[in-house]
Amino acid sequence: MTNINTACVKNNASYQVNNASPNKETISSNFCQRLAQWGNKSLNNGEERAIAVERIKEAYNLNMASLDLSYLDLSELPPIPSTVNTLNLENNCLTCLDFTDNASLANINLSFNKINTITFPNESKLENIYIDHNNLESLDLKNQHSLVNLEAQNNNLKKINISDSYKLKFLNLNYNKLASLDLSRQESLIELSAHHNMI
C-alpha cells in the first residue's frame, strides 16, 4: 500500500501528516490527520483516493468554495473543507453518506452513485441537491429551508419529506415508487415532474 503523505498549510503554519498521532491542538492539523487516514485506507477496489486527496488539499489550502471529486470510484466520503459550498461527487460508488458536519454546503451533486442512506445537516444552507440515479427508498429533507432545486429521479423512493422546503421551485421525482406526495407548503414551486410513480 502506498502511504499518502498529506501536507496541509493553513494560517502560515505547515502540518506534515503521516501515520503519527493526531495533533488535537488545532482544527487544521486535525483535518489533515483525518484526510491522511482516509487517503491511506486501502480498499483495493480501484478507488482514486490519491487524486481525491490532492484535490481536497488544494481546496483546503486555497480556501476554495468548489470541490470536484467526481468519477473517482470513491466508496466513502472524505473529509470536506469547511470553505467548500459546492461539492461534486457524481459518478462514484458511495452508499452511505453523512453530511451533518458540512453545514456550509449549498450545492451538492451526488448523481449516479449507489446511495441508500443519507443524512443532511439540520437547517443547512443547501439550495441545490442532485441525488438522481441512486438507491434511496426514503429521503428526509426536514428543516432544509433554503432548498430551491431537488433532482431525485431514478431512485426507489417510497417516502420523501420536503415539508420545510417552502422555497422549493424545481422538483424532479420521476421513476420512483411514491404512492403520495404532499406539496401543500411548496407555494414557490414552478416545475414539478413526478411521472412513473404510483401516484
PLM region spans:
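Non-Sec secretion/translocation targeting segments of pathogen effectors
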Residues: 1-25, 29-31, 35
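Low-complexity, intrinsically disordered tandem-repeat tracts enriched in small residues
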Residues: 7, 13, 20, 95, ...
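Non-core capping and flanking segments associated with repeat-based/extracellular domains
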Residues: 30, 36, 87, 108, ...
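LRR N-terminal entry segment and analogous cap-like coil->beta motifs
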Residues: 40-97
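Conserved hydrophobic beta-strand positions in leucine-rich repeat
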Residues: 65-69, 87-89, 106-110, 127-131, ...
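Canonical leucine-rich repeat
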Residues: 77-80, 97, 118, 139, ...
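Leucine-rich repeat
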Residues: 80-84, 102-105, 121-126, 142-147, ...
